[in-house]
Amino acid sequence: VGSDLPKAQLGLNIGADWKGFDLNLFFNSIIRDAWNNSKFYTDFFPLWTGNHGTQLLDAAKAYEDYLRTGYYASDVPAPTVDNSNSENEGSQYYIEDGSFLRLKTLTVGYTLPRKIQDKLFLKNARIYFQAQNLFTITRYSGADPEGLGYPYALPRQYTFGIQFGF
């Protein structure tokens, strides 16, 4: 059916500093196909119980068209009430382009001028702001292409900090 082993894993770190300010960006990327576990559990898995995913409606419409025309034109499996088609079995339907590019870490900092540090009896005094997982560019329809199989995206995290020495 496919493999979610990465074809490539990439990283890019960009850093710059100017007049006491520093900026650092870290991007990571993976190029691969991915099993969409969210799609697996929401589209057809509960077919014989409870609520149903909206893909079921598309498949039902395609089946009505099939009865009329003899041609089944849908990208979703043909469901049955008794699950005899094994809609929830692994198939190409659940494989997607799981490639992504993510801004993993952004850090902006400012190092205090030497004169101010000397007055405060400090060394290497720096304040900074750091953010993680700010954005992801992907065609993957699940929650997160990096944490496959989990129903939640990676959280954004924000940190303010102070570094100094004596």
How would you name each of these model-derived features?
Residues I30-F121, A125:
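Extracytoplasmic gating/loop element in the C-terminal half of outer-membrane beta-barrel translocons
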Residues A8-I14, L103-V108, R156-I162:
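Hydrophobic, lipid-facing positions within transmembrane beta-strands of outer-membrane proteins
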Residues L25, I127-F129, I162:
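Membrane-embedded beta-strand positions of outer-membrane beta-barrel proteins
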Residues G20-N24, K115-I116:
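Repeated loop/turn-to-beta-strand initiation elements of outer-membrane beta-barrel proteins
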Residues A8-L10, K19-F21, S99, F121-A125, ...:
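Outer-envelope beta-barrel architecture signal
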Residues D17, N28-I30, Q130-L134, G165:
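Outer-membrane beta-barrel pore domains and translocons
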Residues G2-K7, Y93-R102, Y152-L154:
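Short sequence motifs at beta-strands and strand-loop junctions characteristic
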Residues A59-Y71, N88-G90, L134-F166:
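C-terminal beta-signal and terminal closure region of outer-membrane beta-barrel proteins
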